[in-house]
Amino acid sequence: MALSSTAATTSSKLKLSNPPSLSHTFTASASASVSNSTSFRPKLTLTRLSSSFLNPSTILHLTPSQRTNRPSSSPFTVRAARGKFERKKPHLNIGTIGHVDHGKTTLTAALTMALACLGNSAPKKYDEIDAAPEERARGITINTATVEYETETRHYAHVDCPGHADYVKNMITGAAQMDGAILVVSGADGPMPQTKEHILLAKQVGVPSVVVFLNKQDQVDDEELLELVELEVRELLSSYEFPGDDIPIVSGSALLALEALMANPTLKRGNNQWVDKIYQLMDEVDKYIPIPQRQTELPFLLAIEDVFSITXRGTVATGRIERGLVKVGDVVDLVGLRETRNTTVTGVEMFQKILDDAMAGDNVGLLLRGIQKIDIQRGMVLAKPGTITPHSKFSAIVYVLKKEEGGRHSPFFAGYRPQFYMRTTDVTGKVTSIMNDKDEESKMVMPGDRVKIVVELIVPVAIEQGMRFAIREGGKTVGAGVIGAIIE
C-alpha cells in the first residue's frame, strides 16, 4: 500500500491514538515514513495499552542499537488520555472495506485529517493507523484498527479493515461491528477478488448500508473508464443483494487529499478539489447510512474482541456492545469456551474517555474484577447473568456458496469439519447430518445448495437462535447460515 515519500516525523510525545477495542500493538518511529519503502523504521518495545486504565504515563523505550540511528536519544512518552465521554451526537460504527492496496488506510487517514480541520477529530497519519510493524513492513493492514471522528451531526467510530486475503478472519470481526461501510475500489483497477469477498462478508455479517469511494481517480485519464468501473461496482453490489443502483458513489484520490492536508492541515472546504471529495464522501455517509435502532432495552451482551492485562489494575476486555447497557458495579457472566463464571465491572471506557454507562453500539473497554488474563479470551461473551448459555450442538439453515461466488468447487458430505465464525470467535465444528428442503436426510451438499444441517462444535460457545455465522475452510468463505434451534 505505497503512499508517499513524505516523511512525517513523530513528535517526542505521542498520545494514544486508538481506542481500547482495536488491535493492541502500538509502535512509533522517529522518522516514520508514510511510504512502503525500505527506509529505516525502528521498532519500539511492543506494549499492550488501554489508555485511561493505565497509569498516567507509560514509557516506551527504543533499544540502544535503534537509538543510535535517531536524531535524539530521548524515549517516546505515551500518555493516557483522561476525561469523560459526552454523548452530544448519535454514535455510529462504520469502516473501510475493499481489496488490498486500493487505499482503505489512506482514506481513513484523509478522513480524520479533513474532519480535524473542522475541529471534529484528532488527525491520524497513515502510519498511526497501520500501527503494527508487520503491517507497516508489508504495507498492508492485518488487525482491524479503530479511530474516531465527528461530522456536524454524528460521532463515528471507524474501523480500518484488512484487505489482505490471509487476514479475512480479522475483517470478519471488524465487519461484525459495523452499522455501515465505505467500500474502497481503485478506479484504475476496478473490483478485485477481495472486493467481492468483503462485499459478501459484509452481507453475511449483516452490514446494512454501503457507500462507495472510487479511489485513485488521478490515475484514470479516461472519464469513460471510471464510469465503466462505477457500473461494474453497482452490478457487483446488486449481485450480493445490496441496492446497487441507489448506493452513493464518490470518486476522488485519498492520497492526493492526504498529501494536501499534510502540507496544509488547515485546508477548508472549497480550497482543494481532492479534499472536497473527502467532505463529499462524508456528506453521503451522513445522508445515506441510517442511525441504527440500538437494542438498549435487551439484556447486556458484549462479544470480547481483545484482552489486556494492566499491572495493578486488572484485566480489560474490549469489544462492541451488541445489546443492553452496562455501568460500573454491574455483575456480568463470562460465557463460552470455558466454564461460565461471573465478575464485576470496575471501569468502563470508550476512546480513552471514562463513561458512566455504556450502551449498545459502543466500542468499549471493561475493567473486570478478579479476572486474570489467562481466564479470558477473544470469542467469549460478557452478558447479564443468566441471559445466555454456552452450547455445542445446533441445527441451522445454511447457504453453500457456488464456485463463482468464491466457494467450494466440490460437494461436501456428513462428517465435514470446517471453521464456524460466530461473533468474534472461530471454532471447528462437525456437520453431523444434512437435510433437504423436505426434511429428508441427504448424503451430500453441492455448492449453491440451501440445506438444513446439524453441527457439533468442539467447544461450547455462547450462541442463540437466529444468530448468523459464516463457514470457512482453507482461507475462504464457503457458506453462511442462521441458527435455527439449539440442541444441546
Curated annotation (Swiss-Prot):
MF terms in GO: GTP binding; GTPase activity; translation elongation factor activity
- Region: Disordered; residue ranges are 1-20
Stretches for region G3: 160-163
Location comes to: Plastid, Chloroplast
Q: Which residue ranges are recorded for the region named G4?
A: 215-218
Segment G2: which positions?
Answer: 139-143
tr-type G domain segment(s):
89-293
Q: Name one GO cellular component term.
A: mitochondrion
Cleaved signal peptide residues: none
Q: Transit peptide residues?
A: 1-79
- Would you kindly state one Gene Ontology biological process term found in this protein's UniProt entry? mitochondrial translational elongation
Subcellular location, principal? plastid
Q: Where is this region: G1?
A: 98-105
**Region of interest called G5, as start-end residue ranges on this chain:** 253-255
- Lineage top rank: taxon: Eukaryota
UniProt KW keywords: Chloroplast, Elongation factor, GTP-binding, Nucleotide-binding, Plastid, Protein biosynthesis, Transit peptide
Tell what triggers its expression.
Induced by light, low temperature and salicylic acid (SA). Repressed by high salt and abscisic acid (ABA).
Protein residues bound to GTP: 98-105, 160-164, 215-218
Q: In which tissues is it expressed?
A: Higher expression in leaves than in roots.
Gene3D superfamilies, alphabetized: P-loop containing nucleotide triphosphate hydrolases, Translation factors
One Pfam annotation reads GTP_EFTU_D2
Similarity comment text for this entry: Belongs to the TRAFAC class translation factor GTPase superfamily. Classic translation factor GTPase family. EF-Tu/EF-1A subfamily.
PANTHER family noted in UniProt: ELONGATION FACTOR TU, CHLOROPLASTIC, ELONGATION FACTOR TU-RELATED
Q: What does this protein do?
A: This protein promotes the GTP-dependent binding of aminoacyl-tRNA to the A-site of ribosomes during protein biosynthesis.
Name listed for the protein in its UniProt record = Elongation factor Tu, chloroplastic
Q: Give the encoding gene's name.
A: tufA
